[in-house]
């Protein structure tokens, strides 16, 4: 049996911050969007997957800057649901070109948009039969770039 080949879409954004990558063994089942700056500014993303033993595999990107977290929103991805696409915008926030809004699309529905739809739009291809199995990008104080690891189901 052939091992599935993952492809990469993106990353979209800029070259600031440090590279990060999250490719869990099991599917991503929760995403937390953290806001800061006294408003609807997404400054951090947390991706989680549940391992076979029940423990969590988690990464948080962004959120290390001078802004304190003022709120969060949680996306729970159901057992019959899987990620198929992302879209959003990158724009200027405190003199940085960073993630300003994001929508997570699954085989069942769209979650979002989260944040403010300002700046330059981006979108991953929503290819039928593809599942997002991980994320990659760049981050420092904020999310500077984001892309996806995709696998044909």
UniProtKB/Swiss-Prot annotation:
InterPro entries: Jacalin-like_lectin_dom (IPR001229), Jacalin-like_lectin_dom_plant (IPR033734), Jacalin-like_lectin_dom_sf (IPR036404). One of its GO terms (biological process) is heterophilic cell-cell adhesion via plasma membrane cell adhesion molecules. The modification N-acetylalanine is found at residue 2. GO terms for molecular function: carbohydrate binding; cell adhesion molecule binding; D-glucose binding; D-mannose binding; identical protein binding; protein homodimerization activity. Rhizome (at protein level). Detected in the cortex and the pith of rhizome. Not detected in vascular tissues, pericycle, endodermis or rhizodermis. It is found in: Cytoplasm. Not glycosylated. Can be used for the isolation of glycoproteins from humans, plants and fungi. Is a powerful T-cell mitogen in the mouse, and can thus be used as an alternative to concanavalin A for the mitogenic proliferation of murine lymphocytes. Identified as one of the several suitable fluorescently labeled lectins that can be used in a combination for the visualization and quantification of extracellular glycoconjugates in dental supragingival biofilms grown for 48 hours in situ in the absence of dietary carbohydrates. Used in lectin-based microarrays to detect altered glycosylation in cancer tissue. Residues 6-152 form the Jacalin-type lectin domain. GO terms for cellular component: cytoplasm. PROSITE patterns: JACALIN_LECTIN. Keywords: Acetylation, Cytoplasm, Lectin. Hemagglutinating activity is most inhibited by methyl alpha-mannopyranoside. This activity is inhibited to a less extent (about a third of the inhibition of that of methyl alpha-mannopyranoside) by methyl alpha-glucoside, other alpha-glucosides, such as maltose, isomaltose, panose or palatinose, and alpha-glucosides modified at the second position, such as methyl 2-deoxy-alpha-arabinoglucopyranoside or methyl 2-acetamido-2-deoxy alpha-glucopyranoside. Gene3D superfamilies: Jacalin-like lectin domain. Residues 17-18, 95-96, 140-144 are annotated as: N-glycan binding. Homodimer. Belongs to the jacalin lectin family. Mannose-binding lectin. Preferentially binds mannose at concentrations ranging between 5 and 25 mM, but also binds glucose. Has a marked preference for methylated sugar derivatives, such as alpha-MeMan and alpha-MeGlc, at concentration down to 5 mM. Binds to N-glycans, but not to glycolipid-type or other type of glycans. Binds N-linked high-mannose-type glycans. Has a preference for smaller (Man(2)-Man(6)) high-mannose-type glycans to larger (Man(7)-Man(9)) ones. Recognizes both alpha1-6 extended and alpha1-3 extended monoantennary glycans. This is Jacalin-related lectin Calsepa. It comes from Calystegia sepium. The lineage of its organism: Eukaryota, Viridiplantae, Streptophyta, Embryophyta, Tracheophyta.
